[in-house]
């Protein structure tokens, strides 16, 4: 009975350990997806394309699994919070950028929920992206 209990306990511990490593791997790959979308956005430098790249980065990261979706949310929220602070420092309490930030967050959520990021793709954006 002790052997059976020990085997069950060990399998539970190893199972949780395995899930944790899987989550971390997904988060790491999801963070790379977010970085790739950001790099592509900077490279494209295409007018009105930021929502597309927000949605695409979140979509790609979330496709990795729960760890990727978590990383996408953390990175997206951090980016928007930093942008809010810099907007406040530049423009004071004018509300500048609030609507854009809300639209960015909507695009982020769109992508994370598995919806097609091409919904936000602007006409004329090169096929490379």
Swiss-Prot record:
This is Serum amyloid A-2 protein. Residues 1-18 form the signal peptide. It is found in: Secreted. Belongs to the SAA family. Residues 90-129 are annotated as: Disordered. The modification Pyrrolidone carboxylic acid is found at residue 19. Its main location: secreted.
